[in-house]
């Protein structure tokens, strides 16, 4: 029997820890997001086990969507297995009803474990220490567990523990305008002779979600862990499943309560087999014990961190904040399931309804490409598996090829809501689903970025090429020919900056459309010359004719690129420079821009203020298209007009700031990005993690300060720059199958090959090296 580790014995070093030192129920929503535990299959928000005022409990399973009475399909808040209530002589103990003598919660990012340490005094003067930890297993993704250490400090008496699975959950429970119930309970039963089972079904497609749970209660000092509960009752409480147990509490004697939970859905097994699957897995989990699964879970995190961890010496704040972003990003992926992706808010909350945006391909995917290539391929396979839906989406909109939706769920069709609210709470039409077309090229771009970093020719031949060709076909049909100017234009769009709608010839969109078609033509040539069997197979499959290819060449050649090479200032879209100009001069306590005086936030489209990086984003993703002076001129112009109302923005300005020499602002933008959730500088951490910002923060560390980039010849270049107080930066990446470790100090840069048989050619500060 394994030794039980108490909180202090299990917890790691301080550099891996995120603390909550004070209880304030007004901050519950923020900490529930920060302390979410997820394994890519399911995510459990960091609510208190016993419940508290102002909480936003959430349990989410990747791929479980439903529309019901909502505007669009949304990620379902499924039954909450985590509730565990404590009673002293029949009186419930809750944080809001007791005097808190001690309080602390700690997220251990190294192990993927959430700890708690509380001492409470009830209204009868009884003092109880409640410590513990919980985890959502990375080893067996269906398993989760909670361990409580309960110690009566000044009394003896009967202590009750209520184990609950709550099926009364709602989506948007705190918002009457949007409140929806997506589930109905179909089974509420006892399980394993000493546990509870709740099975629910979604209201539209009858997708089943099954959760089983049981408790084990024993004295801490008992190495045999004999049950000490003298009473147990199973109670099916309508939509909630419960069991209630009692034991005798003795002064200063610690009792351990282990809660085991297992979750399966009809995506995993047939509906008729769900209860058997849950029961068998739960029985095995309990038989093997809490500690065995915890050890396996921690071992999986050790594997992930062995590549993913980045160390910053000399700046503890940046070091921990960066690690926090990496932790949540790498925890959010399920590399075994190519039918799900990572939503904009991860599995951490209901924000953006669990939908997948361009955030995944442009902001998150680079982390996985260089740190976890297997997961990167899986995320791109999600887009391939949704390719038929993208074809239908294009056809519905009157275009050819494949048009990826702005917001995607489990079907691959457009799921953007039609209505929302502006900054003053006024109802507004949401046009992004109709007009923000650049996502189609973003997906194709991500496919190519993955390929050039991995050389995964199998993926490119069987999946990636088809994505690039069908998206190129979309752009060739989306472009409009203007005869009097003899050029193709892309009108009535929204670029990355969403303050401006219905614009013509957005620079980012036009550049990416041109790139997409050009890359499609290159792939056709490569397939025809070097992979003729694949060439004939794919052109036959998608009915691509030589005549259509010639049309692509014409469109690609004549796409209007709005760039004045003399002025070197790129107009974000036609007419942008004619808008009313405001310059940002003030910043709030989080160093976020404050609206300039006189701005009407209901008419932002009439100004030059922009929501997020647009032209700057373009120059970062296509650096070879612009010289250094052009990058500097455009960075300086747009930086003063960017409100950073999207968490995606600061990281891009940080990297470009480093490229053009604005080091001070680059570091500030990096901290903005790294602490978007830790400091809640967007004010909406309650809705879920800013997953794209997590990816962007990693990009600043590696592509920015770490200086990693790929040149025109496809060679890896490292040209780093460290902030003054940073003594050393160290990171690891995979490059074409080899694992490299890069260490940047003030005076030197070292690169080691840790794995890989092939010789790797790189350039460090312009000097060629072979590893």
Swiss-Prot record:
The enzyme's E.C. designation: 2.4.1.230
Protein name (Swiss-Prot/TrEMBL): Kojibiose phosphorylase
Enzyme class: transferase
Active site: 498 (proton donor)
Keyword Protease on entry: no
One Gene Ontology term from the biological process aspect of the record: carbohydrate metabolic process
Family matches, as SUPFAM superfamilies: Galactose mutarotase-like, Six-hairpin glycosidases
Keywords: Carbohydrate metabolism, Glycosyltransferase, Transferase
One Gene Ontology term of the molecular function aspect: hydrolase activity, hydrolyzing O-glycosyl compounds
Organism: Caldanaerobacter subterraneus subsp. tengcongensis (strain DSM 15242 / JCM 11007 / NBRC 100824 / MB4) (Thermoanaerobacter tengcongensis)
Residues the record lists as binding substrate: 358-359, 611-612
PANTHER family per the UniProt record, alphabetical: GLYCOSYL HYDROLASE-RELATED, PROTEIN-GLUCOSYLGALACTOSYLHYDROXYLYSINE GLUCOSIDASE
Physiological role: Catalyzes the reversible phosphorolysis of kojibiose into beta-D-glucose 1-phosphate (Glc1P) and D-glucose.
InterPro entries, sorted: 6-hairpin_glycosidase_sf, 6hp_glycosidase-like_sf, Gal_mutarotase_sf_dom, Glyco_hydro_65_C, Glyco_hydro_65_M, Glyco_hydro_65_N, Glyco_hydro_65_N_sf, Malt_Pase/Glycosyl_Hdrlase
Cystine pairs: none
Family of this protein: Belongs to the glycosyl hydrolase 65 family.
Reactions accelerated catalytically: kojibiose + phosphate = beta-D-glucose 1-phosphate + D-glucose
Pfam family, one: Glyco_hydro_65m
Gene3D superfamilies tied to this protein: 1.50.10.10, Glycoside hydrolase, family 65, N-terminal domain, Maltose phosphorylase, domain 3
Gene it is expressed from: kojP
């Amino acid at each position: 029997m394994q030794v039980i580790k108490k909180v202090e014995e299990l917890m790691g070093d301080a550099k891996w820890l995120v603390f909550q030192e004070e209880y304030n129920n007004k901050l519950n929503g923020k900490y529930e997001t920060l302390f979410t535990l997820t394994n890519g299959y399911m995510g459990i928000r960091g609510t208190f086990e016993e419940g508290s005022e102002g909480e936003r409990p959430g349990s989410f399973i990747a791929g479980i969507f439903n529309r019901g009475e909502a505007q669009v399909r949304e990620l379902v808040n499924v039954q909450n297995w985590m509730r565990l209530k404590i009673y002293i002589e029949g009186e419930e103990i809750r944080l809001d009803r007791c005097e808190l003598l001690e309080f602390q919660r700690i997220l251990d990012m190294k192990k993927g474990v959430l700890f708690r340490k509380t001492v409470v005094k009830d209204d009868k003067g009884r003092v109880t220490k409640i410590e513990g930890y919980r985890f959502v297993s990375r080893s067996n993704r269906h398993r989760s567990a909670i361990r409580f250490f309960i110690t009566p400090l000044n009394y003896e008496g009967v202590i009750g523990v209520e184990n609950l699975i709550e099926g009364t959950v709602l989506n948007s429970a705190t918002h009457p305008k949007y409140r929806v119930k997506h589930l109905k309970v179909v089974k509420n039963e006892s399980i394993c002779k000493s546990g509870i089972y709740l099975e629910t079904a979604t209201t539209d497609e009858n997708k089943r979600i099954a959760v089983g749970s049981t408790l084990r209660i024993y004295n801490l000092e008992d190495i045999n862990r004999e049950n000490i509960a003298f009473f147990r009752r199973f109670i099916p409480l309508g939509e909630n499943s419960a069991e209630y147990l009692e034991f005798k509490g003795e002064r200063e004697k610690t009792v351990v309560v282990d809660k085991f939970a297992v979750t399966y859905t009809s995506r995993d097994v047939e509906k008729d087999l769900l209860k058997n699957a849950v029961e068998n897995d739960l029985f095995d989990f309990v038989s093997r014990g809490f500690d065995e699964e915890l050890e396996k879970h921690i071992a999986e995190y050790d594997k992930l961190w062995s590549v993913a961890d980045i160390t910053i010496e000399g700046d503890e704040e940046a070091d921990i904040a960066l690690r926090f972003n990496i932790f949540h990003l790498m925890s959010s992926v399920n590399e075994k399931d190519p039918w799900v992706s990572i939503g904009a808010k991860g599995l951490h909350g209901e924000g953006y309804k669990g939908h997948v945006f361009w955030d995944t391909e442009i902001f998150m995917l680079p982390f996985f490409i260089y740190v976890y290539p297997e997961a990167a391929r899986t995320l791109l396979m999600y887009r391939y598996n949704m390719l038929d839906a993208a074809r239908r989406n294009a056809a519905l909109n009157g275009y050819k090829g494949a048009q990826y939706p702005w917001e995607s769920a489990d079907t691959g069709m457009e799921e953007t809501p039609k209505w929302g609210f502006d900054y003053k709470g006024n109802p507004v039409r949401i046009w992004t689903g109709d007009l923000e077309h650049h996502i189609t090229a973003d997906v194709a771009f991500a496919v190519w970025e993955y390929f050039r970093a991995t050389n995964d020719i199998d993926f490119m031949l069987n999946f990636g090429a088809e994505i690039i060709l069908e998206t190129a076909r979309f752009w060739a049909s989306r472009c409009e020919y203007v005869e009097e100017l003899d050029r193709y234009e892309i009108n009535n769009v929204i670029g990355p900056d969403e303050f401006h709608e219905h614009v013509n010839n957005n620079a980012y969109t036009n550049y990416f459309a041109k790139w997409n078609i050009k890359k499609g033509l290159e792939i056709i040539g490569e397939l025809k010359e070097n992979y003729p069997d694949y060439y004939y197979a794919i052109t036959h499959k998608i009915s691509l004719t030589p005549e259509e290819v010639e049309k692509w060449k014409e469109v690609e050649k004549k796409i209007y690129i709005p760039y004045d090479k003399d002025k070197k200032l790129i107009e974000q879209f036609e007419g942008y420079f004619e808008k009313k100009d405001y310059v940002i001069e003030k910043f709030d306590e989080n160093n976020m821009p404050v609206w300039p005086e006189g701005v009407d936030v209901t008419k932002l489209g009439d100004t030059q203020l922009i929501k997020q990086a647009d032209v700057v984003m373009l120059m970062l993703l296509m650096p070879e298209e612009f010289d250094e002076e052009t990058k500097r001129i455009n960075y300086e112009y747009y930086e003063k007009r960017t409100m950073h109302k999207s968490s995606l923005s600061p990281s891009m300005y940080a990297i470009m700031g480093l490229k053009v020499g604005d080091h001070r602002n680059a570091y500030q933008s990096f901290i903005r990005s790294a602490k978007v959730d830790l400091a809640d500088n967007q004010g909406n951490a309650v809705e879920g993690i800013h997953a794209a910002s997590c990816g962007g923060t990693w990009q600043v560390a590696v592509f920015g300060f770490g200086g990693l980039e790929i040149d025109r010849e496809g060679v890896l270049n490292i040209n780093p720059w460290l902030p003054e107080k940073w003594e050393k930066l160290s990171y690891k990446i995979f490059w074409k199958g080899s694992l490299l470790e890069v260490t940047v100090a003030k005076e030197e840069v070292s690169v080691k090959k840790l794995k890989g048989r092939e010789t790797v050619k790189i350039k460090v500060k312009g000097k060629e090296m072979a590893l």
